[in-house]
């Protein structure tokens, strides 16, 4: 049976307490573009970088105020090293808490959105052809 041809990750859907607050956060902090066709109604709100991103959905009626994040630990956006450094400066100016990590082949910066979802930006720091040679 042949492998499926996956083009890439399209979106990660998350539940948030306040759709507008979350949409504004993803735009202000990460520079994602809002995409919300009228035909969809009030949600979801897609926050996109190119053709991939986050789909924001409101919390369900009856959900606790502290939303459960299921088994998702975090989600990551791929950036170049210059953008990673720009993110550090931007997060500092915005007063956001963040964590920098060296993953040998990648460097990453982590922060949390208003609902506590961990958002990572990651940049490869070795030759991509070497790292992805067996993929």
Regions found by a protein language model. Give the residues of each.
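Short glycine-enriched loop/turn motifs at secondary-structure junctions
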Residues: 6-8, 68-72, 102-103
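Short, conserved charged micro-motifs
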Residues: 21-22, 82-87
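Helix-adjacent hinge/juxtasegments
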Residues: 57, 63-73, 78
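Conserved Rossmann-like nucleotide-cofactor binding loop
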Residues: 52, 82, 117
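Short beta-strand micro-motifs in enzyme catalytic cores
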Residues: 43-45, 73, 107-109
